[in-house]
Amino acid sequence: MHWTKYIASCALSLSIGAIALAAAGQSTSPPLESKPAANTPISTASQPAAEEWWKHAVLYEIYPRSFQDSDGDGIGDIKGITSRLDYLEELGIDAIWITPMYPSPGIDYGYDISDYTAIDPVYGTMADFDNLVAEAKKHNIRVIMDYVINHTSDQHAWFKESASSRTNPKRDWYIWRDGKAPGQPPNNWQSWFGHSAWTLDPGTNQYYYHYFYTQQPDLNWRNPEVHAAMDGVLDFWMQHGAAGFRIDAVSRLFEDPGLHDDPYLPGFNAYGDRNIEHKYTDNFPEVHDVLKEVRRVVDRYPGNPVLVTEADEPSVEELTKMYGNGDEVQLPMDFQIADVNELSAPRFRGLFNQIENNSAHGQPEYFFSNHDQPRQRDRYGDGEHDDQIAKLMAVLLLATRGTPQMYYGEELGMRTTDPTRIEDVHDPIGKLGWPKEKGRDGERTPMQWNAGAMAGFTTAAKPWLPVPPSAAQYNVETERKDPDSIFNTYKRLLALRKSNAALRDGSYQAVNESDPNVFAFLRRSGDKTVLVALNMSSKSRKVSFKLAAKGVKGTGLTVLYCSPAGAAVSRVKQVELAPFAALIAEVN
């Protein structure tokens, strides 16, 4: 097919997308069900099964400090999120996962919780949260809470009681041990953030264990009272309208009761410690008992609540265990995919194939950016084709089978903007590991709403983190006006995903599996077959797709989405893809 004919096809695809969006109208997710009133007894019997809405949903992670400030203090808040629900609905989002908004000293910016059943005043009030849930429901958007299950803050009332004496009733709610000798911790276990995982409490002359910061003591999940208390946390937020939970650091819940030393590995970490294998503090089988328990609690509520886990497992086999027998979590986050830091067709193909063939036949959950890792634009961009690569990654995220999870600003092409001086660092990781480790501030900068000095995020003279210079070009207001922007690419793809049955819930099948440059696959539902082709190289590629071997009889292609213009597309044996091109086409 020649250039002019391709442009006509591409233009047609945009029209088809617009028609599909209009026809789709509202989100295809089922209407949200009413929550039980607070303090209403909930039957322990399972509720009637609701549609598995999370299989067709697109999740969107919000870091609340950075999304929208409503009161001019330079920090994002709940009212700010509520004010942007129209935007999220316009984009096509079905559910928002909000990172912790609970009261916290802020050592780890919310992941050190001092009260599980309240809202931190910096973000607002419980009334603000209830209003957010109610308004989100009007936009057919669900709200998923962050369930920080492994540890509390050392300022939590539970820990203060536990630390008050060796005989306190809550002493065993945390993990206390004697040192192996005066001035020496019980063993060599290391904190994820460097140095010993044990801190001496001088008042009781025992050490407490913390997988993360000193100020984040681990709960003792071998204590039934801890189970009961944390189940109460789930009940509280379910009764306030939560649609489910993202469970934090789930693989760290249990440790070796025998306190065996972890094996040392070669080299040193960013904090100067000898590297170790976390053999005795990770992935104990009892984790699955806790996940089953959490599932039983949330399943008492209507609306088919969803559980998402931060499960940075070392293999797809370990990740698969998080599904259980359909009685644990529905969506274990796939860090295998997210940790790929290069555009590699063979590597992505291999990982997608593995998770597709998981023995539990569970629903995949994919993401490429979050609040703990550099943004995808910086990890995959080559400095020359960054915008086009961002569009390719949008297709990879939204056209595969599974539940995609976006990170705020990803739809704009936001960059990671690391601090350049230690004096400007907020994240403790950066403070401890500078300059080798810059911390996570760079991926948590304010959402870029417009090209103004504060990017529309705040009216304050100084936001909590600086607005990146890239906000002048990459922002909602500017990109809305450009039909070929990254924002409009996401919007178009989200509409196509909702309107096309094959993309929404069709099967996945890789094709041309020996191609080192083009990652291609089929999505099939009934008599509909869609081909997705992604050129992950900086050179044009001519590709012939041999689909007959996959049971596909059609040889013609109708373009549904293509970027950039310049490919030659008419039949499966005559496809030319420009550098970093992304193509979605129906086979006929």
Sequence positions of predicted segments:
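Bacterial N-terminal signal peptides that target proteins for export
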Residues: 1-11
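Bacterial N-terminal signal peptides
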Residues: 9-20
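Acidic/aromatic-lined carbohydrate-recognition and catalytic surfaces
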Residues: 26-235, 239, 252-314, 447
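Loop/helix patches that line or flank the sugar-binding groove of alpha-linked glycan CAZymes
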Residues: 54, 258, 262-280, 289-304, ...
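Core domains of carbohydrate- and sulfate-ester-processing enzymes
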Residues: 160-206, 340, 345-358, 433-468
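Solvent-exposed beta-hairpin/edge-strand motifs
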Residues: 547-564
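C-terminal beta-strand-rich structural cap/linker in extracellular carbohydrate-active enzymes
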Residues: 569-588
